[in-house]
Structures are given as structure tokens and as C-alpha cells.
Amino acid sequence: MANLKEIRDRIKSVKNTRKITEAMRLVAAAKVRRAQEQVLRSRPFADRLARILENLQSRMGFEDAASPLMQQRNVETITLVAVTGDRGLCGGYNANIIKRTEQRFAELKGKGFDVKLLLIGTKAIGYFTRRDYPIQATFSGLEQVPTADEANTISTDLLAEFLAESTDRVELIFTKFINLVSCKPVVQTLLPLDPQDIADPEDEIFRLTTKDGLLTVEPGAGPANTEPKIPSDIVFEQTPEQLLNALLPLYLQNQLLRSLQESAASELASRMTAMNNASDNAKELAKTLTLDYNKARQAAITQEILEVAGGAAAVG
């Protein structure tokens, strides 16, 4: 058994580590709330934009859509956009996206497609660069709260590649934020565009509350979608083709921004869960070490008593 000083030093180290993980958990919990609020604030605009595009598309008919961003063409080259974080200590968040990207890459290559990667986040960049994957572009250092400017920079790069026919389809691999303990990697086609409703009935709201004297995040039901439908007889000043060509790039940027926001919320939720588990494990380890320390101390005291008693008997 380790000596008393070693056990005492380890107990101190574990308790200090627990303070760090608990602080990181609280920070992540507060940021999850802000990330969720950002998604909710952007949803009315995204939903209304999608409804307008659906209205325009229904008027034109899919086969009459003149915008090159909606045209289906023979697919030879596919760009996979993988969204990870710049930091670790968030459970399997980054590893799950990397694994899903590798699976999708192998699947498409097996079907004979030319596949290249656009990587967001240093974790994905480092992993795929070391393994010599074909990389189209990389983006890192994004804000913890994704901005429209960042989404615009990435979407502009994707649009240029798609319009130049350097790629025929763009697929986005990101982490969908379902709830605080459930996030899953999903694959979504970005280009060519096919506007759909933004709202998700699985969405939940998370509130920062206190429980047993500790800060925690609890889920609640999301707000009902009360967004009015676009009237079918609405008159647009421009032609549907002109409106589509003007709004589709904005729609692409908004879809990308929403995915970045969901990924950010998922990363924070994963980090909060990971730090909560780490804090619990540190607490249990400290208890075990304290028990070992008490046993070692008792054994040392018993040994000293036996030595003293033995010495006294020898003298007598």
C-alpha cells in the first residue's frame, strides 16, 4: 500500500481537479443557455424565408426552377463539410463527427464518386490532414457563438465551387442538438438546394435553474410554431426567378448558420455532461482514496503500538 504522504498528495490533486471540472461544467451550462437562445432568435427569420421559397417554388414548379442552385445534375464530385470544435474535453462530440465523416467518405468512394472535404474546426483539420485526405478548404477559430459573417464566408466558398461545377453536390455533416443529453451526427444535403420547413417538433428549451443548491440546466417544452402561412395570392414585384436567385444564397447561408449554431450547442452540452461525469468520478475517487488513507494510517498506528509493546516486553 502506498505511504501516507503519497495518498494525501493524490487526494489533494483529485480535489483540485474536481474544482476545475466543476467550474467548466458551470461555464458550459451557462453557455448552453445562450446558444439555445441564439437558435430561437434566428428561427422566425429562417422559417419565414423557407416558407417564401416554398411558395415561389410551388408557383414555378420544380422542373421550371431556373436557379442553378436548385438544378439537379449528374453527380461526379461531392464535397463533404464536417463541423467539429476547436477544443476537446467534450466527450465523444468531435470523435463522432470524425467517425461519421470517414464512414460517409468511404461509402461515396466505394460508389465511384470523387470526394473532397471542407473542414470546420481544428479537431477535424488535424485528424484528416495527418491522414492525407483530399481537403478543399479549412476554417477554424470560429466564435463560440457562430455569427452570420462566419457562415457567409463558408457559404461563399461552397457557392463558388458549386457554380463553377468543381463539385456537383455538397453534404454537411454536423451534430444535431436534440436535447441536453442527446445529440447525434447527421448528414444533410446543402447543394443543390431544396427549401424545407425549419421548425423541428423535437426542439426543447433549456433553462438555468438551481437544484439541491447547485446550478443545473433543465429542459422544457419548446414554443408552439405560430408563424402564419404565406398567403397563396400574395403578389411579388419581381418575377419568381429573380426572387429565387436573390434569396437562395441567403437561404444557404442561413441553413449553414443554423447548423453551426446547433453544433455549438451540442458541443457545449457534451462538454457539460463530460465535466459533470468527471466531477462525479473525482468525488468517488476522493472518497476511495480517503478510505485508503484511513486504512493506511490505522495500519501505521497499529504497527507502532505493536513495536512499542514488543520493545517493552523485550526490556521487561
Curated annotation (Swiss-Prot):
Keywords of this entry: ATP synthesis, CF(1), Hydrogen ion transport, Ion transport, Membrane, Thylakoid, Transport
Main location: membrane
InterPro entries linked: ATP_synth_F1_ATPase_gsu, ATP_synth_F1_gsu, ATP_synth_F1_gsu_CS
Ion transport recorded as keyword: yes
GO MF, one annotated term: ATP binding
Localization per Swiss-Prot or TrEMBL: Cellular thylakoid membrane
Pfam family, one: ATP-synt
GO cellular component: plasma membrane-derived thylakoid membrane; proton-transporting ATP synthase complex
Function: Produces ATP from ADP in the presence of a proton gradient across the membrane. The gamma chain is believed to be important in regulating ATPase activity and the flow of protons through the CF(0) complex.
Family statement drawn from the similarity comment of this UniProt entry: Belongs to the ATPase gamma chain family.
NCBIfam families: ATPsyn_F1gamma, PRK05621.1-2
Name of the protein in its database record: ATP synthase gamma chain
Species this protein is from: Synechococcus sp. (strain CC9605)
Taxonomic lineage: Bacteria, Bacillati, Cyanobacteriota, Cyanophyceae, Synechococcales
Gene: atpG
